[in-house]
């Protein structure tokens, strides 16, 4: 994973999600502004919308890594239907105490 995503930063964190839909948020506790997400499964919808200065960017292609700035830009998922949706998110995070706070915060948005 490190070779595929060299600009994520340290420590490299991976989160596996199943059927997760997140509300609008920023990943404020990430150590780096760079995050990646990859989608897997057979489903409809479920796109990740990233609010960038140039306009909204919609990420949906499956089985590829999508690079986005999760710390700097608001982002959220659209609802999905018709099957199981998996995603893997790669990012770096600041410290153990913040890791616990991040996990708790994401329970409120995802």
What are these regions (language model features)?
Residues 1-45:
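Conserved double-stranded beta-helix
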Residues 42-45, 49-110:
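Catalytic core of Fe(II)/2-oxoglutarate
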